[in-house]
C-alpha cells in the first residue's frame, strides 16, 4: 500500500510541476503548427505590442517558418504611417499577410482603411497561395479578444463593463441584505456612492504609490485624473489600479458612512460589504483578463493552463504562453463570495459583528498571496523581501488583521432585534 501511495504522490507532484512551474522560451518565441492543406509546417510564433520590437524582428529573424500575430496596437489607424512602414519591411523580407480567418491578402497596398483587417504575417519556405487552406494549431490556447462592443462611434470596453457589472450587482446584493436585516433602504445609495469613490481613487493612488511613484514627478495630474499630460493633453482612463489601495480607501470611506450616515458599528457594515467586494473582485479580474493584463509567468505550452496573450503589454516581458492568473483569482473570489453568502444566509454569524469581515480578509488576501507566486511583477517592485513581491508583502498585514478581527468579533455580538436598529 505504501508503494502505491508513493507512486500516487510522485505522479501528483509531476502533474503539479508540469502545470505550475515557470518555463523558459528561447528568443521569446513559442511553437505552433501551420496546417497548409494536408501539410503540417512547424512555425515559430512572435507577437509584441512595441513598434520598435516589431520592426526589429522583421530584420533579425532568420527562421524560414515564422508567424507573427499582429495585435490592435500594431495596426491602429492612428499609427498608420509608422505601422505601414514596419509592415513594408515584412513584405520586403518575403512575409505574406493574412486576415483573422487566415485568408491570404494578395498584392496588398497598405492603407488607413485596410490596415486593421490584417491579423497574421507569415513566412514559409514555400510561398502560400490564395488556393491554399491555412490554419494554425498550438498546444496552448490563444486569447485575443476585441477590446469591447462597438456601438457606432462609441466603444463599450469590456473592462469598463466589468466595473459596471461589479457595482451594479453590488448594489442589488446590498439592497437584498438590507431588506433581510430590516434596515431602511435609504442607506443603500450612500454606501454605494462612498464605496465607488473610495474604490476608484484609492485603487489609483495606491497603484501609483506602490508601483509607479515616479508619476508624481513625471505626470502629476494623471495620478488623480483619467488624463495624460506628458505628450499633450490626452484622455487615457485610469491605467493602473491597485486593490490594496482600494481596500484602505474603502475602509476609510466606510468608517465615515458608519459613524455619520447609518450610525451603526463599522464592523456590521464591513461584514456585508465584504460579501459584495468578493464578487466584485471577480468581475474586476475578468476585466483584467479582457485587457490581457496582470498576467502570469511563462508556462509549459502543454500545460492545461497555458494561454498566449498577443495583446499583452511589453512591460510583462516576452509574449509567450502564460498562466491566466486573472482567472485563478476570479475563481477564488467567486468561491469566497459563495462561502460568505451561505454563512450570511444560513448561520447567525452576521450577528457576530466583524466575524464575516475577518474571514473575508483572511481568505481574499490569501488567494492574492498565493496567486502572486505565478504572476509577473506589475512594473518595478517597490517593496520586496525574502523572495516575496510587493503584492504578497502588502497582503500579509491584511491577513493578520483578519485574524485579529475574527478573534475580537466575540465582543460585538448583537441580537436579531438589535441588528435592524441604527446605533
What do these predicted regions represent?
Residues 20-151:
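Low-complexity, proline/glycine-enriched hydrophobic segments characteristic of transmembrane helices
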Residues 2-42, 123-423:
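A feature for loop-to-transmembrane-helix boundaries and adjacent hydrophobic helices
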Amino acid at each position: 500500500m505504501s508503494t502505491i501511495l508513493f507512486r500516487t504522490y510522485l505522479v501528483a507532484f509531476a502533474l503539479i510541476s508540469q502545470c505550475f512551474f515557470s518555463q523558459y522560451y528561447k528568443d521569446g518565441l513559442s511553437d505552433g503548427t501551420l496546417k497548409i492543406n494536408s501539410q503540417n509546417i512547424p512555425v515559430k510564433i512572435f507577437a509584441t505590442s512595441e513598434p520598435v520590437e516589431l520592426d526589429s524582428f522583421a530584420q533579425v529573424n532568420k527562421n524560414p517558418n515564422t508567424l507573427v500575430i499582429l495585435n490592435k496596437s500594431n495596426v491602429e489607424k492612428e499609427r498608420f504611417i509608422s505601422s505601414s512602414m514596419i509592415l513594408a519591411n515584412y513584405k520586403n523580407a518575403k512575409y505574406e499577410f493574412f486576415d483573422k480567418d487566415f485568408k491570404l491578402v494578395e498584392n496588398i497596398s497598405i492603407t488607413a482603411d485596410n490596415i486593421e483587417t490584417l491579423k497574421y504575417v507569415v513566412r514559409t519556405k514555400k510561398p502560400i497561395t490564395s488556393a491554399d487552406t491555412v490554419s494554425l494549431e498550438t498546444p496552448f490556447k490563444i486569447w485575443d479578444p476585441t477590446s469591447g462592443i462597438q456601438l457606432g462611434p462609441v466603444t463599450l470596453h469590456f473592462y469598463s463593463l466589468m466595473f459596471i457589472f461589479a457595482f451594479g450587482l453590488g448594489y442589488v446584493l446590498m439592497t437584498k441584505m438590507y431588506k433581510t436585516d430590516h434596515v431602511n433602504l435609504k442607506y443603500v445609495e450612500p454606501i454605494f456612492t462612498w464605496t465607488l469613490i473610495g474604490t476608484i481613487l484609492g485603487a489609483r493612488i495606491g497603484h501609483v504609490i506602490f508601483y509607479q511613484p515616479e508619476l508624481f514627478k513625471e505626470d502629476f495630474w494623471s495620478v488623480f485624473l483619467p488624463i495624460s499630460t506628458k505628450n499633450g493633453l490626452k484622455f487615457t482612463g485610469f491605467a493602473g489600479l491597485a486593490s490594496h489601495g482600494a481596500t484602505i480607501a474603502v475602509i476609510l470611506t466606510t468608517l465615515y458612512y458608519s459613524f455619520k450616515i447609518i450610525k451603526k458599528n463599522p464592523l456590521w457594515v464591513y461584514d456585508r460589504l465584504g460579501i459584495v467586494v468578493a464578487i466584485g473582485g471577480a468581475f474586476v479580474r475578468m476585466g483584467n483578463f479582457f485587457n490581457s493584463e496582470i498576467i502570469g509567468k511563462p508556462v509549459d505550452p502543454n500545460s492545461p493552463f497555458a494561454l498566449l496573450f498577443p495583446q499583452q503589454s511589453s512591460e510583462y516581458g516576452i509574449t509567450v504562453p502564460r498562466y491566466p492568473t486573472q482567472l485563478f483569482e476570479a475563481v477564488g473570489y467567486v468561491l469566497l463570495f459563495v462561502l460568505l453568502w451561505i454563512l450570511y444566509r444560513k448561520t447567525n454569524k452576521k450577528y457576530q459583528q466583524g466575524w464575516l469581515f475577518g474571514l473575508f480578509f483572511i481568505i481574499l488576501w490569501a488567494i492574492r498571496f498565493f496567486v502572486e507566486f505565478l504572476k509577473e511583477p506589475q512594473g518595478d517592485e517597490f517593496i520586496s523581501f525574502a523572495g516575496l513581491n510587493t503584492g504578497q508583502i502588502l497582503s500579509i498585514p491584511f491577513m493578520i488583521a483578519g485574524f485579529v478581527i475574527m478573534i475580537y468579533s466575540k465582543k460585538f455580538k448583537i441580537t436579531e432585534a438589535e441588528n435592524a436598529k441604527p446605533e
